Structure formats: structure tokens, C-alpha cells
Amino acid sequence: MLELKEITKTFHPGTVNARRALDRLSLTLEEGEFVTVIGGNGAGKSTLLNAVAGAFPIDGGQILLDGQDVTHMPEHRRAAFLGRVFQDPMMGTAPTMQIDENLALAARRGRRRGLKWGVTRAEREEYRALLAGLGLGLEDRMSAKVGLLSGGQRQALTLLMATVRRPKLLLLDEHTAALDPKTAGKVLELSQQIARRDGLTTLMITHNMKDAIACGSRLIMMDGGRIVLDLAGEEKRRLTVADLLERFSAVSGREEAEDKLLLS
């Protein structure tokens, strides 16, 4: 479904600040897989998602989605079949627009728009049902401005907007990191629920080892722009945080991981 073939990316090449963020990285995701990605700061996790999303050109390698070569496809064109949720709840929504208007924008992404714009009654009923599934009461507040929502409500709405058109690939970039633990748990639960319901192929970055182990069907660990661990099936189900820390130390050559990586 998603295939990355030896992709590389170096920032500030030819300078003293040159840094290789992706080092001939190869990865294949099957349709419907939910893969969690962990690693220390600078491991290349966000660079990986940005490369897939087309946020910048890669230096080498190939990116295939559903067999189509999208390596040189610009970001705005990839947005038609990718969904993405960022760490900052303020990103991904229009704060001065209503909840239903935000959903309408997301639903029409990639489509040709005419001079007439508005939310139809049928669309409002569709959005009401989708919002009710979040369990946050937003279906009764569809005329509210998004800027008035809490961080958790806004992130849940962003998740819904990213998946309303059932994208080929869902990218979750530490999307619960800025939320309090209770709200983060709720958004994470919703993420898994929506991915399972719609059979979405999902790539989720997290610094929380417990979440990385508990979520999805596969776990990969990055270090130095490479994938150093790739676990699935029974091997992943048997994992503990202690096991993961031991494996991280073994493959990275460090005594212990960064504090942020150990959050659990």
C-alpha cells in the first residue's frame, strides 16, 4: 500500500550544520496496517512523515502509494488522499469558522469548488452523526466557532476532518503530546476506533512507549534516520516497556534513552 525505497534526506547539505535525517530508509505498509513509530529526538520520525506527505523533496529514493509513484508529487496534490493530524491542536482547523463549516472544508478537499459555497442540510445531518460518534457533545454545537473549543475537542475534530473522506493513508504526528493525560487517552482511543472502522492504513509517531506497544498491529523504532527495530504479531503483543528500553539500548549503543522517549 505504502512503499518507501531507500529514501534519504539531508538538511543543510554542504555546510557544517549538515545533518542526514533519513538514511536510505525502506519501509512497506500493507493496507489497513496501524504502525506506531518511536525513537529519540532527531531519530527522523517527523522527517519520515513529512517526506511521505510531500512537505519537502527527498534527496534520493522512491515513495509509492497504492503502486503510484508520488515521489515528486507536490504536497497539495497528496493532500487529496492523505489525512494528517499534527501535535498542535491549533493546526488543521479554521478557528473563526463553525464546526460544520470546518467539516465541509475537509469533505470537499481536492474537489473543484464553484462560486456557491455553503453547508447543505444533508451535509449537516451527516456531520451530526459523525460528531456524535466522538462522544464529546459536539453534534449539539455545530454552529460554534472552532476557536472556542478546548484543545482536546479541537484535536478530536481535526482527527475527524482528516478522516472524513477516508484517506488512503492517515499520518498522526505526536497528535496527543500537547494534551493532558485523560484527554490524550480519549483522542488515542478515537484514533484507533476510526482507523479500525474505516480500515485506514495509519502511521503514528509517539514518544509514549506504552502507547506504542498498546496501539496498532506493528511497531517500528528509528535511530539515526534508519529503522532499527520492526516488530509485529505475537512478538509485539508480548512486549513490555522494559523490553523496549533494553532493545533500544542494544541497537542504539546508548545506556539509556532520552527522558522524553521514556514517558509512559
PLM-predicted stretches and their roles:
Residues 206-207:
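H-loop/switch region of ABC-family ATPase nucleotide-binding domains
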